[in-house]
Amino acid sequence: MEIQQTHRKINRPLVSLVLAGALISAIPQESHAAFFTTVIIPAIVGGIATGTAVGTVSGLLSWGLKQAEEANKTPDKPDKVWRIQAGKGFNEFPNKEYDLYKSLLSSKIDGGWDWGNAARHYWVKGGQWNKLEVDMKDAVGTYKLSGLRNFTGGDLDVNMQKATLRLGQFNGNSFTSYKDSADRTTRVNFNAKNISIDNFVEINNRVGSGAGRKASSTVLTLQASEGITSSKNAEISLYDGATLNLASNSVKLNGNVWMGRLQYVGAYLAPSYSTINTSKVQGEVDFNHLTVGDQNAAQAGIIASNKTHIGTLDLWQSAGLNIIAPPEGGYKDKPNSTTSQSGTKNDKKEISQNNNSNTEVINPPNNTQKTETEPTQVIDGPFAGGKDTVVNIFHLNTKADGTIKVGGFKASLTTNAAHLNIGKGGVNLSNQASGRTLLVENLTGNITVDGPLRVNNQVGGYALAGSSANFEFKAGVDTKNGTATFNNDISLGRFVNLKVDAHTANFKGIDTGNGGFNTLDFSGVTDKVNINKLITASTNVAVKNFNINELIVKTNGISVGEYTHFSEDIGSQSRINTVRLETGTRSIFSGGVKFKSGEKLVINDFYYSPWNYFDARNVKNVEITRKFASSTPENPWGTSKLMFNNLTLGQNAVMDYSQFSNLTIQGDFINNQGTINYLVRGGKVATLNVGNAAAMMFNNDIDSATGFYKPLIKINSAQDLIKNTEHVLLKAKIIGYGNVSTGTNGISNVNLEEQFKERLALYNNNNRMDTCVVRNTDDIKACGMAIGNQSMVNNPDNYKYLIGKAWRNIGISKTANGSKISVYYLGNSTPTENGGNTTNLPTNTTNNAHSANYALVKNAPFAHSATPNLVAINQHDFGTIESVFELANRSKDIDTLYTHSGAQGRDLLQTLLIDSHDAGYARQMIDNTSTGEITKQLNAATDALNNVASLEHKQSGLQTLSLSNAMILNSRLVNLSRKHTNHINSFAQRLQALKGQEFASLESAAEVLYQFAPKYEKPTNVWANAIGGASLNSGSNASLYGTSAGVDAFLNGNVEAIVGGFGSYGYSSFSNQANSLNSGANNANFGVYSRFFANQHEFDFEAQGALGSDQSSLNFKSTLLQDLNQSYNYLAYSATARASYGYDFAFFRNALVLKPSVGVSYNHLGSTNFKSNSQSQVALKNGASSQHLFNANANVEARYYYGDTSYFYLHAGVLQEFAHFGSNDVASLNTFKINAARSPLSTYARAMMGGELQLAKEVFLNLGVVYLHNLISNASHFASNLGMRYSF
């Protein structure tokens, strides 16, 4: 008996993806993305009609696996639920294939002809308002479903989680819905182990022709525990109202997935909304080909997993795809519901059984209550995808038709993933009449494009006038922190535009020079736009605060009045590394670039050309930092027009200027220590006119090739100037001059004007015309070539009277005042022996000369009114550190330097400042440092470098370790040399020690004696010690800590002897007083030792070796010594052999022993070569070093033995080196040599003491200290040890 139930009615909440169809149909096309942002995504975040918590799966995707997607309503309650359970026969054959429809479904699915649509369709038995549940959860094998086309409902739920489902094979399947007044949603669920799609699948299609009844909505859920795949020819089509839920470990769809298919012919204007939910896919989701739109404005949504890959994405010209990535941490599951699969509670079910068909019919309980639920209001904002969310699209393509629409069409791709990557396939925009636009936006993350941008499948493809093609990319729309990166060169044809909004935009290259009339709109970039190469021609560029590595302005076609226009305020942080204006042919084929406004533009290199213009008059300040020159100086036809407001020529920048430059400066001009090269054309130079003020800033830097101050203005080919004519170089309302080296500047300052005039130089080829410095006959020839005096060139000996003099060409006069800078050329004068205009050059007295050049200097002592500021007559060669002190008027400091730092300090300063840099750098350093500080720093540096070169320093760690071991070995020899006893034999002594003790029963008395009685005979010993040591020498200190271990024994045969061996490890560190030299070393020491007895005579022999690996660094804090900072490493090694003889004087039954001794020893010390890791010119280098030492020693030792095992000793002695030889290679810094000679033969005094106590049977504690003092160098060394010994 079936119990009927009244259907309850639930209105759809306004946040559903399916309901979005009705909403968006009334919204202009351009607002689709905004709708997803303001409605859909807030709904996903905020939860939906069921009242779920924010961020839960059920709240976000209740149309997903919980089957409530459509309109976010609860599933429609069926009138009847049919159940089919697969029998046990389906559980037995895992390799068998079944037809799912024929085997299980057909008994509860009816079919018939749809006259309205002229097609056959299928439905659940009894009508589309019923449900079929198929329980085959234990079934195995493969089940094919092929040809189930136009399944119109109701719900179908197939649970086959251990089997494989093949959809398609010989025919496809289509799942759709039955449109009635209740707007039912068809839900089809397949839960399998694997699902493969082998033929087409349609979701929510219209039956047959589609002319009849409409479809409502359909949800197809495919869930597979292992994987979901589709073949290359298997197309999945989603029509309006379709939802596809995919849940698996991985999804790979090789066939085309088509979202937004037309439901019937002519449905171009009908809205289409479809959804794919992959949020339950644990791994990657791979769409080989995804198509959105079928000549309609389809809107599609993908609820994505962390990683989504799309091979080719085809968007119709007005379609939109929204890919929503999960938030950080993923979606949270909603608590499990207590409702059953049919949507009713498990109690009060009425079930009728049909045993023959293995089918149950379950009727819902009586329930006449009607429930009205109002639409859910969701108020929340969008969310960002998690930091690992990625959407990868290899190729993005749009499709278009020839439809003309005002404003064109816009296709869109929107996501919130952390990273949206478009691969090497790039982007293609299909353009037609009225224009097309593609919008790619990432609301909260970054966009990366690795491939080219194409129009109509052509790189550099163009659009027709009035039908512009527009690319729009927006990164971080909501976060304002996204980065858009384009890793391929972008080439845009005519009327093709590019718009990018982001926090930062990075471009490899942009070429709009293929015809022009493009717009590059980067006004939405809030931080920086970085472009490696920008090629323009008639391009509108809207950008602020940019870095352009190279800007090339082309002159393509007739472009009068059409220039590249930077149409926005460029800000204060814009920079172009290189500007190149290409050459035009004539005025109508010209080009140019202009700027709307801006605070500052920095250009490193600027190359201008004829018929190409640069108009920066609306930029407040432009600075040229390296080069300002014509790109065609050898072919200067045509004209350029270069226009600036305020222009600065930066330090060391060079400007080439001629009448072809056509330079206009309407504001101020600052030459900040740059050089202006004036080119003589037709006997004239072009005047540089400055609209307001000019400032000529110069310094005292020296041209090392000539000895002159570096010129601020050069006139090349000055011999061609028209004679008897004033040639005005620069005019301004007011001109000021400044010497940055001395910190002086001013207007109408005669001294500064005279200094400036000596930095105005005239050249004939490379030879200076206005002044000649003659040091030899070659200088005479050069002077003759400069002034056109052939006699001086051919017969230089006739002009030897000029040698040692500076001669001034009085045929040239210079003017530098507050309004103009000019030269007047009368023609060259001729030097004569007594003609004057010369200044004697004094004899150089410096022995350590580096060059014969001379340097100009302010107020030189030889200067007179005829030649002010002309040539410096220094007492030292130019290029020496002394000459720099002279130029700074600090000659007296030279003596101070030698007095307090010596020749070595002077040579080090020469190396650091001049040999590794130049005189200008040296001048800067000494100007910033007092003489006292210079000598202090040099002394600290030479001390540190002497340590670096010293072999004693390199051996310090090994010697401290060896000293520690010498103390330990002496203690071991003292211990094993015991002759003191209580005059009873060993056996009796051991029995006496057990007196009064009781033991458990043992096998024999011998066992008692062995286990519990102490042993007094000299045993075999294993010993280990912790060691530490330190060395103090001239304000530096070294420390060591480590461990030593060994084994020894007393041999009592034909010969009484002690033999032993040891090994030790110690880590040593070193730092000098200034903490500028720091070292750390791992050291190892190993060897053998012995003592032979002949009555009271003792003969000692010892051999050992040591190896240390050192890592050192120089760390100077002062700017003066900063180039010395570097690190290096090397190996140190040593080998030692010792022999000594001593005689024992015994007292108190051998309890007290006094032993004098003498000995000799040999040491071989060495270190490997090294080179520091520095890349500077003062990289430290040192060759290998090796020394052989011979010494003798005399010692006295007192030993006191007490008890049966303990002792104490004192040892003192003197060691004298009597010979040494070897090599100590020189350490070097560039030209500076550090030859640290070894100290003279040394005398050492040594004292040590130690002893041992018994802690337990056969376990002993020993302690010792040693002190060694070098009586020559006053260096001190200290070491101690604490150790244990075990005898057996």
Swiss-Prot record:
Keyword Secreted: yes
Disulfides per UniProt: none
Alphabetized UniProt keyword annotations: Cell outer membrane, Membrane, Periplasm, Secreted, Signal, Toxin, Transmembrane, Transmembrane beta strand, Virulence
SMART domains listed in its UniProt record: Autotransporter (SM00869)
Compositional bias (Polar residues): 352-376
GO molecular function annotations of the record: toxin activity
Pfam family, any one: VacA
InterPro entries named in the record: Autotransporte_beta, Autotransporte_beta_dom_sf, OM_autotransptr_brl_dom, Vacuolating_cytotoxin
Autotransporter domain ranges (all copies): 1015-1288
Biological role stated in the UniProt entry: Induces vacuolation of eukaryotic cells. Causes ulceration and gastric lesions.
Description of its domains: The signal peptide, cleaved at the inner membrane, guides the autotransporter protein to the periplasmic space. Then, insertion of the C-terminal translocator domain in the outer membrane forms a hydrophilic pore for the translocation of the passenger domain to the bacterial cell surface, with subsequent cleavage.
Name of this chain's protein: Vacuolating cytotoxin autotransporter
Record gene name: vacA
